[in-house]
Amino acid sequence: MRAVAPIGAFATPDNFSAPVGSKLVGAAFEARAQEFLQRQRLRFVARNVACRGGEIDLVMRERDGALVFVEVRARAQRRYGGAAASIGWRKQQRIVRAAQHYLATRSSQLRDQPACRFDVIAFEAGRLVWLRDAFRADEV
């Protein structure tokens, strides 16, 4: 399922060329993605979960208890396939590895193994695009 929203308050072209560096620009887009998902009634769990093999930008929880691991990408233009297309097979593997690490290190806090989903929030060409269930762990 794909949800598209005009960026409007989410971003301006200045965010793509800010002299403060890509880490701060990335953090700003992650914050905007988090705000968007919370308005969609997902609950914030964690941000920038890292392990040796990868990182997850956002961990959210659906109302039904499912954990949603979110990759946030931003591109000023849609050339070369846009932001979502930049998440290739290797990046998907790293995200899945980080999610497995996250679940393993928090198994004592989780009563049962929750259902999990991998989503992408892409900011591209003036729009926010939400790709629910963008890829599956068993496909990478």
Swiss-Prot record:
SUPFAM superfamilies associated with the record: Restriction endonuclease-like
GO molecular function, one term: nucleic acid binding
Disulfide bonds: none
Segment forming the signal sequence: none
Highest taxon above the source species: Bacteria
Family indicated by similarity: Belongs to the UPF0102 family.
Name of the featured protein: UPF0102 protein Bxeno_A0149
Organism field: Paraburkholderia xenovorans (strain LB400)
